[in-house]
Amino acid sequence: MHCHAELRLSSPGQLKAARRRYKTFMIDEILSKETCDYFEKLSLYSVCPSLVVRPKPLHSCTGSPSLRAYPLLSVITRQPTVISHLVPATPGIAQALSCHQVTEAVSAEAPGGEALASSESETEQPTPRQKKPRRSRTIFTELQLMGLEKKFQKQKYLSTPDRLDLAQSLGLTQLQVKTWYQNRRMKWKKMVLKGGQEAPTKPKGRPKKNSIPTSEEIEAEEKMNSQAQGQEQLEPSQGQEELCEAQEPKARDVPLEMAEPPDPPQELPIPSSEPPPLS
């Protein structure tokens, strides 16, 4: 069942004279041993015309019944372009060819099935997805937070020039200021809705007309805040004056006549301890 190595010298004339003539057109006749020998010589002659070699196969075909029945399959796998148009494509032959090619690759690269196992492991392992690098969280200082909060109380939405000025004054970037404002507005909206009031923005997130204060409203609010602070400073001073007045004696309410000092107390005679004289 196996082809042994032979070495023959031949000429093109002899090869042409030995042209194979099929008796029938059955698949058994086309894939018989004689046809195998003929096409093997033809394929080797195309490589080296003066030397026709029929090599011994590296392994036996005992594992595949198709290769045992049709020895020409070994020639087809080595030179598929020579007789691919002569052999009809059947499912059994295609399966045998694929099995033969895989076994040859395994025996040539890594004995013991190491190459096959490595190729299967490479195909089975999915390629890991590259995770996007997370943006580092900005840590604000107390001074920066106070400045941002104070500006937010006055103006809930910043224009580009205002955002640039605020970022430069606090030593931040525009992106950091914008991100902080977005998070602060979300917190503010939740507080407003929790208090039972109407949402200060439209459903798409756009601010309503009344929610954005104008410059006049901002100036009026600043004036009111300054006045309130002035009143708070005056109230403690007035309270201290009232306490001082309450602690002073009420001498101013007493008339001058009654305000004279009282007479000094009269001295009483001290009784003597001596007994009275006897008569």
UniProtKB/Swiss-Prot annotation:
Q: Which GO terms describe its cellular component?
A: actin cytoskeleton; chromatin; cytosol; Golgi apparatus; nucleoplasm; nucleus; transcription regulator complex
User: Which sequence positions fall in the DNA-binding region?
Assistant: 133-192
- Positions with biased composition (Pro residues): 261-279
Looking up CDD domains in the UniProt record yields:
homeodomain
* Transcription listed as a keyword: yes
Q: Where in the cell is it found?
A: Nucleus
Q: Which InterPro entries match?
A: HD (IPR001356), HD_metazoa (IPR020479), Homeobox_CS (IPR017970), Homeobox_TF (IPR050848), Homeodomain-like_sf (IPR009057), HTH_motif (IPR000047)
Q: Where is the composition biased (Polar residues)?
A: 118-128, 225-240
Q: What is its main location?
A: nucleus
Top-level taxon of origin: Eukaryota
Note down the stretches annotated as region Disordered. Answer: 110-137, 194-279
Q: Which GO terms describe its molecular function?
A: chromatin binding; DNA binding; DNA-binding transcription activator activity, RNA polymerase II-specific; DNA-binding transcription factor activity, RNA polymerase II-specific; RNA polymerase II transcription regulatory region sequence-specific DNA binding; sequence-specific double-stranded DNA binding
Any one Pfam family match given in the protein's UniProt record, by short name: Homeodomain
Gene3D superfamilies per UniProt: Homeodomain-like
Which UniProt keyword terms apply here?
DNA-binding, Homeobox, Nucleus, Transcription, Transcription regulation
Q: What does this protein do?
A: Transcription factor. Binds optimally to the DNA consensus sequence 5'-YYTAATGRTTTTY-3'. May control the expression of neural adhesion molecules such as L1 or Ng-CAM during embryonic development of both the central and peripherical nervous system. May be involved in controlling adhesive processes in keratinizing epithelia.
Family statement: Belongs to the BAR homeobox family.
- Would you tell me the protein name for this molecule? Homeobox protein BarH-like 2
Which species expresses this protein natively? Homo sapiens
| Lineage of origin | Eukaryota, Metazoa, Chordata, Craniata, Vertebrata
Which gene is this protein's source?
Answer: BARX2
